[in-house]
């Protein structure tokens, strides 16, 4: 029986997940990615929005409201996509993969953490480009943590990144920056 290109891709992706997940056997790696993932649950973004308001007043409030509106759209979008796709998480599909932290929901596609991190970062950087040295590495860490911790496939993270770019771009077009 022939293997389809999609099956080959799924096999490669599963191997990549197993390899990435193996790094969490090291306590420091596991702790680092667990903390990044936990901050990506929302804590980091809520603190950032509050700090923007405190440090930049009305302009910070405007940026924070824009981020919150984009975050709400991201939440509704990814919840709907997860219910529609119903893709099992890597640890549920392959017993060699361990979930090193508890997932927030049942399904894998797309990565909600990544979708939020990328969309929040794009909107925040539109207002405050000088935050890039903080936000870009953190966002990359959130995306990577989802695969390393056994919660997402790389394609979940890549798809979420693409969706987030489209969503953030649409929000910036719909709610343009003040002149």
Task: Specify the residue positions occupied by each region the protein language model found.
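Residue-level signature of the transmembrane alpha-helical core
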Residues: 35, 50-51, 68, 136-140, ...
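Interfacial segments of alpha-helical transmembrane regions
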Residues: 49-77
């Amino acid at each position: 029986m022939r293997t389809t290109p999609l099956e080959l891709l799924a096999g490669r992706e599963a191997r990549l997940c197993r390899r990435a997940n193996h790094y969490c056997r090291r306590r420091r790696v596991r702790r680092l990615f667990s903390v990044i993932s936990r901050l990506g649950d929302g804590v980091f973004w809520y603190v950032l929005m509050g700090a923007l308001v405190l440090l930049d007043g009305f302009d910070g409030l405007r940026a924070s409201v824009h981020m919150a509106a984009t975050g709400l759209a991201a939440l509704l979008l990814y919840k709907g996509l997860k219910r529609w796709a119903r893709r099992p998480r890597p640890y549920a599909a392959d017993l060699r993969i361990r979930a090193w932290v508890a997932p927030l929901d049942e399904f894998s596609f797309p990565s909600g953490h990544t979708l939020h991190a990328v969309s929040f970062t794009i909107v925040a950087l539109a207002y405050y480009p000088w935050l890039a040295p903080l936000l870009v590495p953190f966002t990359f860490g959130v995306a990577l943590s989802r695969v390393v911790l056994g919660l997402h496939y790389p394609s979940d993270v890549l798809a979420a990144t693409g969706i987030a770019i489209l969503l953030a771009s649409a929000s910036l077009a719909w709610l343009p920056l003040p002149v």
